[in-house]
Protein backbone atom coordinates (compact mmCIF):
# COMPACT_ATOMS: atom_id res chain seq x y z
CA UNK A 1 0.00 0.00 0.00
CA UNK A 2 2.69 2.45 0.93
CA UNK A 3 4.34 1.93 -2.44
CA UNK A 4 1.09 2.66 -4.31
CA UNK A 5 0.61 5.87 -2.35
CA UNK A 6 4.14 6.99 -3.26
CA UNK A 7 3.57 6.18 -6.92
CA UNK A 8 0.24 8.00 -6.91
CA UNK A 9 1.79 11.03 -5.21
CA UNK A 10 4.71 10.99 -7.66
CA UNK A 11 2.35 10.75 -10.61
CA UNK A 12 0.27 13.63 -9.27
CA UNK A 13 3.38 15.75 -8.71
CA UNK A 14 4.71 14.96 -12.19
CA UNK A 15 1.35 15.86 -13.71
CA UNK A 16 1.31 19.13 -11.78
CA UNK A 17 4.81 19.98 -12.94
CA UNK A 18 4.01 19.06 -16.53
CA UNK A 19 0.89 21.20 -16.52
CA UNK A 20 2.70 24.12 -14.90
CA UNK A 21 5.55 24.22 -17.44
CA UNK A 22 3.54 25.64 -20.36
CA UNK A 23 2.13 28.36 -18.10
CA UNK A 24 5.62 29.25 -16.91
CA UNK A 25 6.96 29.20 -20.46
CA UNK A 26 4.12 31.42 -21.65
CA UNK A 27 4.71 33.82 -18.78
CA UNK A 28 8.41 33.89 -19.62
CA UNK A 29 7.61 34.48 -23.29
CA UNK A 30 5.24 37.30 -22.36
CA UNK A 31 7.88 38.87 -20.10
CA UNK A 32 10.54 38.47 -22.80
CA UNK A 33 8.32 40.10 -25.42
CA UNK A 34 7.42 42.96 -23.09
CA UNK A 35 11.12 43.52 -22.30
CA UNK A 36 12.04 43.47 -25.99
CA UNK A 37 9.21 45.89 -26.81
CA UNK A 38 10.37 48.28 -24.08
CA UNK A 39 14.00 48.28 -25.26
CA UNK A 40 12.98 48.75 -28.91
CA UNK A 41 10.66 51.62 -27.94
CA UNK A 42 13.48 53.22 -25.93
CA UNK A 43 15.90 52.80 -28.83
CA UNK A 44 13.35 54.28 -31.25
CA UNK A 45 12.67 57.24 -28.97
CA UNK A 46 16.41 57.86 -28.64
CA UNK A 47 16.92 57.68 -32.41
CA UNK A 48 14.03 60.09 -32.94
CA UNK A 49 15.19 62.53 -30.25
CA UNK A 50 11.99 62.00 -28.24
CA UNK A 51 13.29 62.76 -24.75
CA UNK A 52 9.83 62.65 -23.16
CA UNK A 53 9.26 59.08 -24.33
CA UNK A 54 12.79 58.14 -23.31
CA UNK A 55 12.23 59.55 -19.84
CA UNK A 56 8.98 57.62 -19.46
CA UNK A 57 10.76 54.39 -20.43
CA UNK A 58 13.66 54.94 -17.99
CA UNK A 59 13.57 53.84 -14.37
CA UNK A 60 14.60 56.64 -12.01
CA UNK A 61 17.57 54.49 -10.95
CA UNK A 62 18.60 53.39 -14.47
CA UNK A 63 22.31 52.73 -15.07
CA UNK A 64 23.97 53.41 -18.44
CA UNK A 65 27.42 51.92 -19.02
CA UNK A 66 29.81 52.55 -21.92
CA UNK A 67 33.19 50.85 -21.88
CA UNK A 68 36.24 52.16 -23.73
CA UNK A 69 38.86 54.88 -24.00
CA UNK A 70 38.52 57.06 -20.88
CA UNK A 71 39.62 60.11 -22.93
CA UNK A 72 36.30 59.99 -24.76
CA UNK A 73 33.77 62.13 -22.86
CA UNK A 74 30.93 59.65 -23.35
CA UNK A 75 32.75 56.64 -21.87
CA UNK A 76 31.82 55.75 -18.32
CA UNK A 77 28.90 54.87 -16.09
CA UNK A 78 25.93 57.15 -15.42
CA UNK A 79 23.28 56.50 -12.80
CA UNK A 80 19.84 58.10 -12.76
CA UNK A 81 17.84 59.98 -15.39
CA UNK A 82 19.47 63.38 -14.86
CA UNK A 83 22.99 61.99 -15.22
CA UNK A 84 21.99 59.94 -18.27
CA UNK A 85 20.36 62.90 -20.01
CA UNK A 86 23.52 64.91 -19.27
CA UNK A 87 25.61 62.17 -20.83
CA UNK A 88 23.34 62.07 -23.90
CA UNK A 89 23.84 65.82 -24.35
CA UNK A 90 27.61 65.34 -24.27
CA UNK A 91 27.35 62.42 -26.67
CA UNK A 92 25.21 64.34 -29.17
CA UNK A 93 27.66 67.29 -29.12
CA UNK A 94 30.53 64.97 -30.02
CA UNK A 95 29.04 62.28 -32.24
CA UNK A 96 26.68 62.00 -35.19
CA UNK A 97 25.34 58.57 -36.03
CA UNK A 98 25.93 58.19 -39.78
CA UNK A 99 24.52 54.67 -40.05
CA UNK A 100 22.52 52.41 -37.73
CA UNK A 101 21.15 48.95 -38.38
CA UNK A 102 19.79 46.51 -35.83
CA UNK A 103 20.51 43.03 -37.14
CA UNK A 104 19.48 40.71 -34.31
CA UNK A 105 17.57 41.13 -31.08
CA UNK A 106 16.29 38.68 -28.54
CA UNK A 107 15.08 38.62 -24.96
CA UNK A 108 15.01 36.18 -22.10
CA UNK A 109 12.82 37.36 -19.28
CA UNK A 110 13.96 40.84 -18.24
CA UNK A 111 17.20 40.74 -20.26
CA UNK A 112 17.43 41.95 -23.87
CA UNK A 113 20.34 41.68 -26.30
CA UNK A 114 20.58 43.69 -29.51
CA UNK A 115 23.31 43.35 -32.12
CA UNK A 116 23.89 45.49 -35.17
CA UNK A 117 26.16 47.67 -37.27
CA UNK A 118 26.77 51.38 -37.09
CA UNK A 119 29.02 54.14 -38.34
CA UNK A 120 29.85 57.36 -36.51
CA UNK A 121 31.07 60.82 -37.45
CA UNK A 122 33.02 62.66 -34.74
CA UNK A 123 32.14 66.37 -34.74
CA UNK A 124 35.45 67.68 -33.33
CA UNK A 125 37.68 65.94 -35.87
CA UNK A 126 35.18 65.43 -38.69
CA UNK A 127 36.53 61.88 -38.93
CA UNK A 128 34.24 58.95 -39.61
CA UNK A 129 34.60 55.44 -38.37
CA UNK A 130 34.28 52.53 -40.70
CA UNK A 131 31.09 50.58 -40.15
CA UNK A 132 31.46 48.48 -37.00
CA UNK A 133 29.51 46.04 -34.87
CA UNK A 134 27.74 47.03 -31.66
CA UNK A 135 26.10 44.98 -28.94
CA UNK A 136 23.69 46.01 -26.22
CA UNK A 137 22.68 44.22 -23.04
CA UNK A 138 19.67 45.83 -21.40
CA UNK A 139 17.48 44.95 -18.44
CA UNK A 140 13.84 45.91 -17.95
CA UNK A 141 11.73 46.02 -14.79
CA UNK A 142 8.09 47.05 -14.58
CA UNK A 143 8.10 48.32 -18.17
CA UNK A 144 11.15 50.56 -17.72
CA UNK A 145 14.79 50.19 -18.68
CA UNK A 146 17.01 49.76 -15.60
CA UNK A 147 20.31 48.88 -17.33
CA UNK A 148 21.79 49.89 -20.70
CA UNK A 149 25.18 48.21 -21.12
CA UNK A 150 26.68 49.31 -24.44
CA UNK A 151 29.53 47.62 -26.33
CA UNK A 152 31.10 48.89 -29.55
CA UNK A 153 34.40 48.95 -31.42
CA UNK A 154 35.93 51.50 -29.08
CA UNK A 155 39.29 51.31 -30.84
CA UNK A 156 37.78 52.58 -34.11
CA UNK A 157 35.79 55.27 -32.29
CA UNK A 158 38.84 56.36 -30.28
CA UNK A 159 40.99 56.56 -33.42
CA UNK A 160 38.41 58.77 -35.12
CA UNK A 161 38.06 60.94 -32.00
CA UNK A 162 41.81 61.53 -31.71
CA UNK A 163 42.29 62.33 -35.43
CA UNK A 164 43.33 65.95 -35.87
Annotate each predicted stretch with a short phrase.
Residues 39-42, 54, 58, 62, ...:
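Hydrophobic pocket/interface hotspot
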Residues 58, 118-120, 152:
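Short beta-strand segments enriched in hydrophobic/aromatic residues
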